[in-house]
């Protein structure tokens, strides 16, 4: 009798949009000021075949770099270290973004995200400071809590999970990120009284070296455009690839926030690239 081969590990690629900063010099509140994002969001893109995705994205980038149409575009010049090195939705031309989205929608991927309203986070920080004047908010605190939220209900879905986080600055935060994943495991087990046996690995990588992180960036960019600018056509485009978007601070209906899924879309979903 032939043994059943083990299930392949689930592979997730995690990036952020916006920033977790609340304060500037001398404690000045930055939320609401120009240049400071109103929302901070963390997203995980689960990719069935990261090698195939990397192959297609790399081939697309080389094809675009060889296209005379983009010859003199600043972001396509290697010295600028932008699109010539890696796709990054914020820096890429609209024509480039269209082609990247076209490739992403052809792959077996699923996107999950958690969104925080930084004004509500600021309210929490102020309330906590009123109770404990020694408390000092750190941006990594918000990031790590969102990691735990993002993976709380996803760690039990397979025997092995590999999570690649986009590098943030020069510090190696692999240990802190592993701890955040363990927090997610503990919260799931406490809530459901069920042990999670999955083996979990966490690592960091630069997006330039991991095309799947570039893909995650594109999904987050689409979500960010909706929340920050009210521009929803990109999130409509990617919605067939979305699992769940949790808007923690949308508490008008339920205290735990709002969950958007295929059955309950964030906005009316349309199909096609338009």
Features from the language model and the residues they span:
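Phosphate-ester processing/binding pockets and catalytic centers
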Residues: 1-274
């Amino acid at each position: 009798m032939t043994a059943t081969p083990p299930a392949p590990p689930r592979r997730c690629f995690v990036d952020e949009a916006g920033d977790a900063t609340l304060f500037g010099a001398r404690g000045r509140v930055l939320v609401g000021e120009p240049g400071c994002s109103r929302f901070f969001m963390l997203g995980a893109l689960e990719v069935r075949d990261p090698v195939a995705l990397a192959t297609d994205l790399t081939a697309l980038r080389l094809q675009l770099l060889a296209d005379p149409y983009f010859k003199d575009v600043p972001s396509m010049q290697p010295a600028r270290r932008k699109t010539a090195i890696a796709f990054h939705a914020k820096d890429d031309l609209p024509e480039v973004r269209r082609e990247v989205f076209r490739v992403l929608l052809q792959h077996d991927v699923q996107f999950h995200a958690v969104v925080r309203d930084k004004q509500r986070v600021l309210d929490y920080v102020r309330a906590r400071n009123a109770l404990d004047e020694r408390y000092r908010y750190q941006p990594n605190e918000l990031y790590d809590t969102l990691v735990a939220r993002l993976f709380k209900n996803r760690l039990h879905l397979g025997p092995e999970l590999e999570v690649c986080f986009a590098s943030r600055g020069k510090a190696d935060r692999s240990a802190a990120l592993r701890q955040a994943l363990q927090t997610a495991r503990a919260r799931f087990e406490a809530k459901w009284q069920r042990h999670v046996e999955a083996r979990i690995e966490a690592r960091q990588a630069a997006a330039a070296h991991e095309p799947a992180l570039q893909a995650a960036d594109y999904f987050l960019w689409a979500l960010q455009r909706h929340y920050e600018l009210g521009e929803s056509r990109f999130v409509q485009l990617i919605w067939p690839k979305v699992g769940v978007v949790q808007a923690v601070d949308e508490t008008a209906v339920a205290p735990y926030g709002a969950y958007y899924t295929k059955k309950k879309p964030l906005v009316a979903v349309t199909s096609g690239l338009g």
